[in-house]
Curated annotation (Swiss-Prot):
Protein family (similarity comment): Belongs to the snaclec family.
Disulfide pattern: 25-36, 53-142, 119-134
Superkingdom of origin: Eukaryota
Cellular component terms per the entry's GO annotation: extracellular region
Phylogenetic classification of the source organism: Eukaryota, Metazoa, Chordata, Craniata, Vertebrata
Keywords annotated in UniProt: Disulfide bond, Hemostasis impairing toxin, Secreted, Signal, Toxin
Quaternary context: Heterodimer; disulfide-linked.
This protein's name: Snaclec 6
Gene Ontology MF annotations: toxin activity
Keyword Disulfide bond: yes
Source organism per UniProt: Daboia siamensis
């Protein structure tokens, strides 16, 4: 009886120590600092990638990166799962509402801009973010 209680207590300690780590994420998702991440090998446009992520799990979106440590974690996760050099991150359409100005300070009264919007990809091996047309296709990393 004493051995049963000892084993049961040991299992309880293991279970409680896993709480708040990978135990909170569904299988095949990775855990880091209270969030869950998954790399998908599908190639999608930014808009389709974001829609895809929102359909995976409640609260899921394209990955957002809030620290160097989180970026390192995501880069390692991508490196383990993909050989593709770039993946979408959740920054997109960021220049849609920006105010434009000529370098000589003249007002912008005439524009001949393409209606194309830009989103950001992460160049994995360089660990840099790059603007890219949102219609480019790249793999998907979701986070919730």
């Amino acid at each position: 009886m004493g051995r049963f209680i000892s084993v049961s207590f040991g299992l309880l300690v293991v279970f409680l120590s896993l709480s708040g780590t990978g135990a909170d994420c569904p299988s095949e998702w990775s855990s880091h600092e209270g969030h869950c991440y998954k790399v998908f090998k599908l190639l999608k446009t930014w808009e389709d990638a974001e829609k895809f992520c929102t359909e995976q799990k409640k609260g899921s979106h394209l990955v957002s990166l809030h620290s160097r440590e989180e970026e390192k974690f995501v880069v390692n996760l991508i490196s383990e799962n993909l050989e593709y050099p770039a993946t979408w991150i959740g920054l997109g359409n960021m220049w849609k509402d920006c105010r434009m100005e000529w370098s000589d300070r003249g007002n912008v009264k005439y524009k001949a801009l393409a209606e194309e919007s830009y989103c950001l990809i992460m160049i994995t091996h360089e660990k840099v973010w790059k603007s890219m047309t949102c219609n480019f296709i790249a793999p998907v990393v979701c986070k919730f």
